[in-house]
Design a protein with these regions (language model features):
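A basic, amphipathic helix-loop patch mediating RNA/tRNA/ribosome contacts
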Residues: 132-186
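Residue-level signature for short turns and capping positions that connect secondary-structure elements
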Residues: 56, 171, 189-191
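A structural detector for beta-sheet-dominated domains
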Residues: 52, 61, 131-133, 187
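N-terminal short leaders/motifs
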Residues: 1-8, 130-138
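N-terminal cysteine/histidine-rich coordination modules
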Residues: 1-86
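Extended interfacial segments that mediate partner engagement and assembly in macromolecular machines
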Residues: 69-131, 137
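A generic structural signal for beta-strand entry/edge sites
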Residues: 44-48, 125-127, 181
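Long, intrinsically disordered, low-complexity Ser/Thr/Pro-rich regulatory/activation regions
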Residues: 182-202
Length: 202
């Protein structure tokens, strides 16, 4: 039996940077707006970030000296209208953040959408597929803690005893997850033990 967890970040990835106004390192988050300069059909585009403690802003470069003919029309429209989904997309775009030497701060919250069969029995072995919708600062361990309602210590004991298999603690702790699918196995009892779901015995 297969259960699918689709994991999606909530909000934005914060960036740590010295704020000249606060005169200390602060967290910055996207303001929700883009800055676009156009000169002779050449575009410069930035995402505007704002200090979480004051109104100081900092621009992260998205496109530099880009000819208008080379940008997708729909993307250009989304940039011009400060589309919220596009702001979030670039907030998690690793290539963009690296190019701007952005220092990541903290780990975003996330939601998990779960899909599983209507029929499930207590002694079944369950294959869990974790789908990361976009790359962000999260570990499989954090996802398991939330979904199984177990502590890190309890999960470690389940891995060591074989109740959770197909994955190691090293893999669970890694925060370098890509937008891909990860799989492991566990018993139906372990999956639903803390969820107040009664499983039938057949």
């Amino acid at each position: 039996m297969k259960v699918t967890w689709t994991v999606t970040p909530v909000g934005y990835q914060r960036i740590a940077k010295r704020c000249p106004s606060c005169n200390i390192k602060r967290d910055f988050t996207p303001s929700g707006a883009f800055r676009i300069n156009s000169q002779k059909k050449v575009l410069d585009v930035w995402s505007i970030y704002k200090c979480t403690h004051c109104d100081y802003t900092w621009n992260i470069s998205l496109f530099w000296r880009l000819h208008v003919s080379k940008i997708d029309r729909q993307l250009y429209h989304r940039l011009m209208t400060n589309d919220a989904a596009t702001v979030q997309h670039f907030a998690y775009d690793i290539a963009t953040l690296k190019r701007n030497n952005a220092e990541l701060s903290g780990r975003p919250d996330f939601t998990v959408q779960e899909r599983w069969p209507l029929s499930i029995t207590a002694h079944q072995r369950v294959r869990v597929s974790v789908r990361i919708s976009r790359s962000f600062q999260v570990s499989l361990l954090s996802i398991l803690k939330q979904q199984l309602m177990l502590s890190a210590g309890e999960i470690k004991r389940h891995v060591e005893s074989g109740k959770i298999s197909g994955i190691t603690m090293e893999m669970l702790k890694s925060r370098k997850l890509k937008a891909e699918e990860y799989e492991f196995q566990l018993s139906a009892e372990t999956l639903f033990a803390r969820r107040k779901i009664v499983l039938t015995h057949r």
